[in-house]
A protein has these predicted regions:
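Loop-to-helix transition at the N-terminal end of transmembrane alpha-helices
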Residues: 32-50
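Conserved small/polar residues in nucleotide/adenosyl-binding loops
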Residues: 174-181
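Hydrophobic/aromatic-rich structural module bridging two neighboring secondary-structure elements via a short loop
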Residues: 61-90
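Transmembrane alpha-helix/helix-exit interface in multi-pass inner-membrane proteins
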Residues: 82-103, 128-153
Length: 181
């Protein structure tokens, strides 16, 4: 483990420690999540998902950043993806139980608000199935397209305002995936 790794771990500990040490700060965090879920999703995904990408880069290349990677553009994109994820979680957590009830599985919506029961487990399974078969493929495709666009723009913040050449990127990804098979 290198000094940079220890510094990264130290920064994470310093960032998270106050939430474990102060009940008031943690309560304020929970209240903020409840009253501003989409703003908090933007911030949390912008920070945590970008940290995950930086860790992935460290594992792959041995560095936390490199020319063309674009930490800031990744953070902005992840922030907006986080808002989209939060909106989909809200939509699916209400919509899927309603659809399940329209198919005759009575009580799913109420079960989702209570303690763990077999019906709540079924509801959670249906929500997960719906999310993973409808939202996830579109999400992962868009995520790959935005990553490619950031890379194609040299990791610059200009990637955030330049039009994304969707067709070209999709064709590039499709042909490179076909070549891997």
């Amino acid at each position: 483990m290198k000094l940079k790794d220890l510094a990264f771990i130290g920064a994470v500990v310093l960032l998270l420690a106050p939430f474990f040490l102060s009940n008031d700060l943690y309560a304020a965090y929970l209240a903020c999540n409840a009253s501003h879920p989409y703003l908090m999703a933007l911030l949390k995904f912008g920070i945590l998902s970008t940290a995950g990408e930086v860790i992935g880069l460290r594992i792959k290349t041995g560095r936390y950043n490199e020319p063309g990677f674009g930490i800031l553009p990744h953070a902005v994109v992840w922030g907006f993806l986080g808002v989209w994820i939060a909106a989909m979680m809200k939509t699916l957590s209400i919509g899927v139980p309603a659809v399940a009830e329209s198919f005759g599985i009575e009580g799913v919506a109420a079960a989702m608000k209570g303690e763990l029961t077999p019906l709540k487990f079924i509801g959670a399974l249906l929500i997960s199935l719906t999310m993973n078969t409808t939202f996830a493929p579109v999400f992962m495709t868009l995520h790959k397209i935005t990553d490619t666009h950031i890379l194609n723009n040299g990791g610059s913040l200009r990637a955030l305002v330049r039009p994304i050449p969707m067709r070209r990127i999709i064709c590039l990804l499709y042909t490179s995936d076909a070549a891997d098979e």
